């Protein structure tokens, strides 16, 4: 997780696309899951008077040493969702709707000593509109166990039994 530690006197904003952060950028509210691969974050702070800090740039490179690929993890999730009736097939067709569910793994997180892929669920409408469903899943990269993922009061991801 990417974390910052500051007093409440400051607001922090960040970008991940290489642009300079401003007050209109992503607000830092909770720890950010570590993106897979190479990423560049730019952070800026504003005090109560609106005075900005210098931009801090941080580069991260996360490569997981695991035989579980991202594609295999998503297939495992889809198979479980088919079993419980949430989707009808590996294309993600939702029962009774024309929309489909799509899944994406862009980051990983750690709980205790275990490392998990973080899977975000999207709903894709027939017109191509894609929106987050609010559901998150986690797959342990060492054991291949599937969990539901949620955040606690401090913004850290936690895993819960997948049912």
Mark where each language-model region is.
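Short, compositionally stereotyped local motifs that mark structural "simplifiers"
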Residues: 1-68
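Secondary-structure transition/turn motif
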Residues: 4-6, 121-124, 150-155
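Ordered hydrophobic segments in well-structured contexts
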Residues: 11-14, 42-44, 57, 108, ...
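Acidic Ser/Thr/Pro-rich low-complexity disordered segments
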Residues: 20-27, 86-94, 127-128
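...the same signal can extend to comparable exposed beta-sheet modules
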Residues: 25-27, 71, 75, 145, ...
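Short, non-transmembrane alpha-helical segments in secretory-pathway proteins
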Residues: 65-108
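Exposed beta-strand-loop-beta-strand "reactive/processing" segments of non-cytosolic proteins
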Residues: 94-142
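A short, surface-exposed interaction/processing loop segment used at functional sites
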Residues: 131-163
């Amino acid at each position: 997780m990417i974390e910052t530690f500051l007093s409440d006197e400051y607001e922090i904003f960040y970008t991940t696309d290489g642009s300079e952060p401003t007050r209109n950028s992503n607000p830092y509210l909770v720890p950010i899951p570590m993106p897979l691969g190479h990423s560049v974050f730019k952070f800026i702070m504003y005090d109560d008077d609106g005075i900005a800090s210098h931009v801090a740039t941080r580069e991260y490179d996360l490569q997981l040493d695991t035989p579980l690929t991202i594609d295999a993890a998503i297939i495992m999730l889809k198979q479980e969702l088919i079993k419980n009736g949430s989707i009808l097939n590996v294309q993600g067709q939702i029962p009774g709707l024309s929309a489909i569910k799509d899944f994406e793994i862009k980051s990983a997180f750690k709980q205790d000593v275990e490392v998990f892929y973080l899977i975000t669920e999207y709903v894709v409408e027939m017109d191509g509109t894609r929106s987050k469903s609010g559901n998150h899943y986690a797959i342990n990269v060492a054991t291949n166990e599937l969990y539901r993922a949620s955040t606690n009061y401090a913004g850290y991801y936690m895993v819960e039994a997948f049912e």
